[in-house]
Structures are given as structure tokens and as C-alpha cells.
Amino acid sequence: MTAFRCFPATSERWSDLENLFGKNGANAGCWCMFWRLERSMFKKTKGEGNRQILKQIVDADKQPGILAYEGNQAVGWCGIAPRPDLIALENSRILKRVDDRAVWSITCFFISREARGKGIMECLIKAAIAHARSNGAQIVEAYPIDMQSPKLLGQVFNSYSGYMGVASAFRTLGFEEVQRASETQLIMRLMIKAHVKRKAK
């Protein structure tokens, strides 16, 4: 398996993120704003407006996601943030809150065409978990599609429909299903264990 290196998206890595997303802003001018903005605002800022908003977030050192590198080139992205930062997710009727516990949400993946099929999704998830843990998170939540659901069973994975990830990748890393949001989509969680420092004897 190809070795990837993953890092939080900081202002120093903005040009790498911009090059990865390209002129299309990852997909249709999204720039990873679909879950961050109210739907009406997203429609207004789609494209260049979303690019500017993402840059402002990165420049403010809010580190809205993880970049994966193959060599010196960014080839993958995973969006992660505290759920309250994701306005559209908070307002979602399908992906509504399971409870009132504080969670960090993994919302999307974008992987360059040449890097697909190399196991990069799991690498990004691991880095996202570490990032959330370093920021004090106790629960990481994800909303992947379930390719084993009767409706999707036997179908070929589609990078667009699976932009929120696939359940099998999350299960491999210890996530558990807490709720079925729809026939094909799950809400999954990973409980992050607190590292307790032992007292010196």
C-alpha cells in the first residue's frame, strides 16, 4: 500500500489545498462549504465565494480538514470540524443529532483521481481522529454510505455519492453504527479514549 503523509490544513498549506480542489472547487464550486453554510448562503457563494470563505477559515488557523500527501503533492482531503461549526449539518432533517453530546464531525472526502483505490480514505480518517483528539474531542461522528445495504449491494462505489465516506472504512477503524439515517446512510461514532497520565510512584 502506498505510504501517505497527512497534515491539518493550515495557511502554509493553502496552495496545496487550492491545487487539489482545482478550478472546480473539488465538486461544482463546493470548496467544502456544503455542510458549513446555510443552504441559501451556499447557493449564493457557490464557486469563488466559497473559495474565499474556506481561505478565511484556513487563514484564521481553524484547520477545517486534513490534507493527505503522496510525495510532495496533496492528493486527498477530509473535512472535519466540531458539529456546531457545520450549520447545514445542524439543520439537516436526515442527519439530525442523535443526542446533545459534543461531537466532531467528518463530513467529506475528496481524493484526486490518480490516488483513488490506494487506501487513502482510511489514512485520512486516522489523521482526522488524531486531529480531533488533539483538540479535546471525545466523540468523532461520521455519516458514510453503507455499500452493504440492500439498495446498494453489488453496486460499484461512486466517488460522488460516497463523498461522505463508506461505512466499511470507518468500521475498520473502530466506528460503530449508532443510527441509520436512511436506507443507504449511517450515523457512526468513535469514542475517543482519554489518555490518563499515571502518577509517579
Locations of the language-model features?
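Conserved beta-strand edge residues that scaffold enzyme active sites
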Residues: 72, 146-147, 184
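Charge-dense, helix-prone N-terminal extensions
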Residues: 1-4, 15-19, 40-47, 56, ...
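Conserved N-terminal entry element of GNAT/NAT acetyltransferase domains
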Residues: 1-36, 199-201
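Active-site rim helix/loop that mediates acceptor-substrate recognition in acyltransferases
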Residues: 33-64
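Conserved GNAT acetyl-CoA-binding A-motif
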Residues: 125, 132-160
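Conserved acetyl-CoA-binding loop-helix of GNAT-fold acetyltransferases
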Residues: 106-111, 117-133
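C-terminal "cap" of GNAT-fold acetyltransferases
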Residues: 160-201
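Conserved acyl-donor/pantetheine-binding loop and adjacent beta-alpha core of acyl/acetyltransferases
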Residues: 56, 60, 69, 73-116, ...
